[in-house]
């Protein structure tokens, strides 16, 4: 993971791919260490019905040689670090539900001129 504005600032993080999560959740301390800027807040409903709010930023994410700039949430200590479906799609990856591994996905386009 890198700061898209200052690419020299980077950190390695292990994430669980979570197809039920819209955004990726990264520990706040890690995002702060690479100077990711907070750009607002997002509200989310958890599986147990609770509503939480987290700060949002944009980070450059690299997985298996694929790179994308993606929205990330500043995770708190109790949050699980995950790679959300938005980042997976931006990276052109999907979870193989049989093996649990990441694999390239076929991207859809309605039309092209």
Where do the PLM segments sit?
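Pepsin/retropepsin-fold aspartyl endopeptidases
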Residues: 1-113
């Amino acid at each position: 993971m890198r700061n898209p504005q200052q690419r020299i600032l980077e950190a390695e993080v292990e994430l669980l791919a979570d197809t039920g999560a819209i955004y990726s959740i990264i520990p706040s301390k890690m995002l702060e260490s690479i100077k990711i800027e907070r750009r607002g807040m997002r509200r989310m409903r958890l599986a147990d019905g609770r509503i939480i709010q987290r700060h949002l930023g944009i980070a450059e994410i690299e997985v298996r040689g694929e790179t994308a700039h993606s929205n990330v949430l500043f995770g708190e200590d109790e949050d699980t670090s995950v790679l959300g479906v938005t980042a997976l799609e931006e990276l052109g990856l999907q979870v193989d539900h049989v093996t649990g591994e990441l694999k390239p996905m076929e991207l859809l386009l309605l039309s092209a001129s």
